[in-house]
Amino acid sequence: MKLAVFDFDSTLMDGETIDILAHHYGVGEEVDRITKGAMEGGLDFYESLKRRVALLRGMELSLVEEICANLTLMEGAKELIQELKRRDYKVVVFSGGFKNATSKARETLGLDADFSNILHHKEGKLTGEVGGEMMFGSSKGEMMQTLQRLLGISPELTMAVGDGANDASMFPFAKQRVAFCAKPILREKANIIIEKKDLREILAHL
């Protein structure tokens, strides 16, 4: 058994969930600026996440669910996941984004698990607060170590795939470190670099 851990936004999914939600809610430009800073490593991930989610306060939960049910998967996602499963990989998503989106992708792609954050809501509207397992820049690396211990899978048999600064904490615990159409801060830590927006490109490196 092997382990493959994927980032969600701009990796398994083509785009950033919070940016898409923000554009529907009319706060897109403000959120875009914060997201860009976070992914390039210029802003602390925890602070940037809190600031972005706060801008969604008052958004209807039903609209959030509708948007998250219709997010576009990255080119080649289904084919890559199917092949990984065929090769006896446990396939998991770690996301600094939201359960509303990752749980639907888990069902669609047949992932083994999804770890992400929760958008708090009250009376059918977002409160502007967020909590969960992936709140910090170090969260993905910590969760990967926990998962490896639970499953009895070594870093030698682990692949990590991501695109942004908050994916870097996974890389010390994975033999295959895939930077997928990634920011420079992640590319310099990778040993596999994919330039084309097609996850099937990873198949050649398995």
UniProtKB/Swiss-Prot annotation:
Its EC number is 3.1.3.3. Substrate binds at residues 16, 52, 95-96, 140, 166. SUPFAM superfamilies: HAD-like. Pathway: Amino-acid biosynthesis; L-serine biosynthesis; L-serine from 3-phospho-D-glycerate: step 3/3. GO terms for cellular component: cytoplasm. Mg(2+) binds at residues 7, 9, 163. It holds the Pfam family Hydrolase. PANTHER family: PHOSPHOSERINE PHOSPHATASE (PTHR43344:SF2). This is Phosphoserine phosphatase. It comes from Wolinella succinogenes (strain ATCC 29543 / DSM 1740 / CCUG 13145 / JCM 31913 / LMG 7466 / NCTC 11488 / FDC 602W) (Vibrio succinogenes). The lineage of its organism: Bacteria, Pseudomonadati, Campylobacterota, Epsilonproteobacteria, Campylobacterales.
